From Swiss-Prot:
Annotated compartments: Cytoplasmic vesicle membrane; Golgi apparatus membrane; Mitochondrion membrane
Entry superkingdom: Eukaryota
Annotated region (Disordered), positions in chain: 169-188
InterPro entries for the chain: Autophagy-rel_prot_27, Man6P_isomerase_rcpt-bd_dom_sf, MRH_dom
PROSITE patterns: MRH (PS51914)
Positions on the Lumenal side per record topology: 19-192
Membrane topology: Single-pass type I membrane protein; Single-pass membrane protein
Disulfide bonds listed in the record: 77-84, 141-170
Source species: Pichia angusta (Yeast)
Protein name per UniProt: Autophagy-related protein 27
Keyword Mitochondrion among record annotations: yes
UniProt keyword terms in alphabetical order: Autophagy, Cytoplasmic vesicle, Disulfide bond, Golgi apparatus, Membrane, Mitochondrion, Protein transport, Signal, Transmembrane, Transmembrane helix, Transport
The MRH domain, residue ranges: 19-172
Length: 266
């Protein structure tokens, strides 16, 4: 009987943890294990004469780990919370007072949305009195230099949006983008050389066609294959003789037009 109860308890434990990196959706992110535990982010607002501070606590677990790290939340958060928000009001010369508690139970089923350089965990349907709250937690692949940790993007008493920029959110085969952006690869010399190579090949084909056509026309007047070969050789020599002058004229036109176009009237 015991061997049937143990797997059942493990299965129930897995379904009672929403952000659980043992879930198959995290299989492409092996470094997410580095984020196991509790994380928090706070935002403070001046509301004279008081000060309002809201703090969000996020718990990331691993039910498949033999020794899971379980950092506890503040006592004001319900025990089954895996995302919890606390609003604290402070007045001069008085102890802070907790006025609002937002809790996302670990019984909520997460929904996953994978983008190019991030993935989002959505938690929907948390109860807060007569209201319903949703949570959006975005994990962004970032280099260690651009990592920002947990960040509160938005909270409007309807949806809370959190963002976590870290290299731990990168896929196993993904390189963190520099400056937080996926930059387009720079043009290298091989691309430009390819253009000039094709232009050179095209020029050679045109010249060869011109030489053969000219030799063929001249040879038809005589009607001898021997004369055709002579005409072909003469056409090649004549074309090669005129080639330097032809290239010089093209270069002069290019550089002359380029220097004139470099200035504008003021």
């Amino acid at each position: 009987m015991l061997h049937l109860i143990t797997p059942l308890l493990l299965l129930l434990a897995r379904f009672s943890m929403a952000i659980d990196i043992s879930d198959e959706h995290f299989s492409a992110y092996p470094r997410m294990k580095e984020l196991i535990g509790s994380h928090l982010v706070s935002r403070t607002e001046e509301t004279p004469p008081s000060t309002k501070k809201i703090t969000w606590y996020l718990k990331i677990t691993d039910s498949g780990s033999g020794s899971p790290k379980d950092d506890t939340f503040p006592s004001e958060c319900p025990k089954d919370s895996q995302l919890c928000g606390l609003t604290e009001i402070s007045l001069p010369n008085r102890d802070p007072v907790i006025t609002e508690v937002f809790s996302f139970s670990n019984k909520l089923t997460p929904q996953f949305d994978v983008n190019t350089s991030s993935f989002i965990v959505n938690l929907r349907g948390a109860n807060w009195g007569a209201y319903t709250l949703d949570a959006e937690i975005e994990f962004v692949c970032a280099s260690d230099d651009n990592a920002e940790g947990l960040k509160l993007v938005k909270f409007d008493y309807s949806t809370v949006s959190l963002q976590y920029k870290t290299s731990s959110a990168c896929k196993s085969n993904e390189t963190p983008p520099k400056d937080g952006k996926n930059k387009a690869p720079k043009d290298d010399d091989s691309n430009s050389w390819g253009v000039f190579t094709w232009l050179f090949i095209l020029l050679v084909i045109v010249m060869a066609s011109y030489i053969i056509a000219q030799a063929w026309i001249n040879a038809n007047r005589v009607g001898s294959s021997h004369e055709f070969l002579n005409e072909l050789v003469e056409s090649i020599v004549e074309t090669l003789t005129k080639l330097p002058e032809f290239l010089r004229e093209i270069a002069n036109k290019l550089f002359t037009s380029g220097s004139r176009g470099g200035y504008s009237a003021v």
